[in-house]
Amino acid sequence: MMLKPSIDTLLDKVPSKYSLVILQAKRAHELEAGAKATQSFKSVKSTLRALEEIESGNVVIHPDPSAKRAAVRAKIEADRLAKEEEERKIKEQIAKEKEEEGEKI
């Protein structure tokens, strides 16, 4: 049985089989968790989708994993702060509308 993408083409993209397996597993978990895909897929399974992305060069090993983790944490924090700000604005708007409604009565 011939697998697509082939191991030979995948090993051209990453330095070792170990690195390939780790990269594929991490990307498959990201896809399962709802990460945006970088392309359209032929495969249904997230593990094979990850291999397709690796083959196309859309997913690569980050040269500095600790920097990537820090960037991910920073993005999560920025998203959290943006959500809190949006909720604060909504609460202010609701309070303002209630105040205006109270003045009309």
From Swiss-Prot:
Which Gene3D superfamilies is this protein grouped with? 3.90.940.10
The protein's organism comes out as Streptococcus uberis (strain ATCC BAA-854 / 0140J)
Q: Which Pfam families does the record cross-reference, listed alphabetically?
A: RNA_pol_Rpb6
InterPro entries assigned to the protein according to its UniProt record, in alphabetical order: DNA-dir_RNA_pol_omega, Pol_omega/Rpo6/RPB6, RPB6/omega-like_sf
Domain of life assignment: Bacteria
In its UniProt entry, what is this protein called?
Answer: DNA-directed RNA polymerase subunit omega
So what does this thing catalyse?
Answer: RNA(n) + a ribonucleoside 5'-triphosphate = RNA(n+1) + diphosphate
Q: One GO MF term, please?
A: DNA binding
State which Enzyme Commission number(s) the record gives: 2.7.7.6
Work out whether the entry's keyword set contains Nucleotidyltransferase. Answer: yes
NCBIfam families xrefs: rpoZ
Keyword annotations for this protein? DNA-directed RNA polymerase, Nucleotidyltransferase, Transcription, Transferase
